[in-house]
């Protein structure tokens, strides 16, 4: 039941976004700037999330290869 509520909520958000985009050419400059800032912020957050996930997956899946261990021999006195 929670999944259907989530899908309906996402659909409603998408419809509101589409309505905003359709009304954007007639909007006032302040509304255009505010909408652009919100879109830019959302895109930045998604990009940073993508970069963080890719860096994490790279370190988890492909651990750094270390060189061969060299045994240290004691020096004679």
Swiss-Prot record:
Membrane protein topology class: Single-pass membrane protein
Domain of life: Eukaryota
Keyword Membrane in record: yes
Keywords: Membrane, Transmembrane, Transmembrane helix
One CC-aspect GO term: membrane
Subcellular location per the Swiss-Prot or TrEMBL entry: Membrane
InterPro entries found in the cross-reference section: SMIM5, SMIM5/18/22
Principal place of residence: membrane
Any Pfam family hit: SMIM5_18_22
Membrane-spanning intervals of the chain: 32-52
PANTHER family: SMALL INTEGRAL MEMBRANE PROTEIN 5
Protein name according to UniProt: Small integral membrane protein 5
Species of origin: Homo sapiens (Human)
